[in-house]
């Protein structure tokens, strides 16, 4: 399932990318769909947090691959929503700020399609023990470096500036 809410809809590059994605998803679905199965569920709208958390919790893989991003809270939300008895695997762009913190994720270059394909393959074959080990590392990181610690670190960094 690809959830793709409209973001920056007034930027022509985003409009162009959205058109490419929609065309490609339609092409793939046209080739491989059956009357009772569709390979890509492309949802071009947003969902409330509760529904998103449910999607995240049920998914085997979270694929978060921005070309450029700040912290990227979606990656952290994916980790936080996981069922500890059967967590999914996070595949994360090296260009997301969260990649520095979430060392249990499989880190990929989003421009390298083969690397993403390999990461998906690794994720699907990963043992339950390794999934759990990776998830524990990430959830501990998220719990330790929460908004309060982040804000204290920001204030400390600002106070250390000398003019």
Task: Write out the residue ranges for each language-model feature.
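Catalytic binding pocket for nucleotide-activated donors in carbohydrate/polymer assembly enzymes
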Residues: 1, 15, 57, 61-144, ...
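Hydrophobic, well-ordered secondary-structure scaffolds
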Residues: 8-14, 133-134, 157-159
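Nucleotide-activated donor-binding/catalytic signature segment of Leloir-type glycosyltransferases, i.e.
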Residues: 4-50
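Secondary-structure transition/capping motifs at alpha-helix termini
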Residues: 27-36, 81-86, 130, 163
């Amino acid at each position: 399932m690809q959830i793709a809410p409209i973001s920056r809809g007034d930027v022509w590059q985003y409009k162009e990318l959205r058109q490419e994605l929609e065309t490609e998803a339609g092409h793939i679905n046209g080739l491989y769909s059956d009357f009772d199965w569709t390979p890509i569920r492309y949802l071009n709208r947003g969902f409330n947090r509760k529904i998103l958390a449910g999607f995240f919790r049920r998914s085997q893989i979270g694929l978060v691959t921005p070309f450029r991003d700040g912290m990227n809270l979606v990656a952290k939300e994916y980790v936080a929503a996981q069922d500890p008895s059967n967590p999914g695997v996070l595949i994360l762009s090296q260009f997301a700020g969260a990649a520095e913190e979430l060392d249990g994720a499989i880190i990929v270059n989003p421009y390298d399609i083969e690397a993403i394909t390999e990461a998906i393959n690794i994720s699907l074959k990963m043992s339950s023990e390794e999934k759990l080990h990776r998830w524990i590392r990430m959830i501990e990181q998220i719990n330790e470096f929460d908004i309060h610690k982040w804000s204290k670190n920001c204030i400390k960094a600002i106070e250390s500036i000398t003019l």
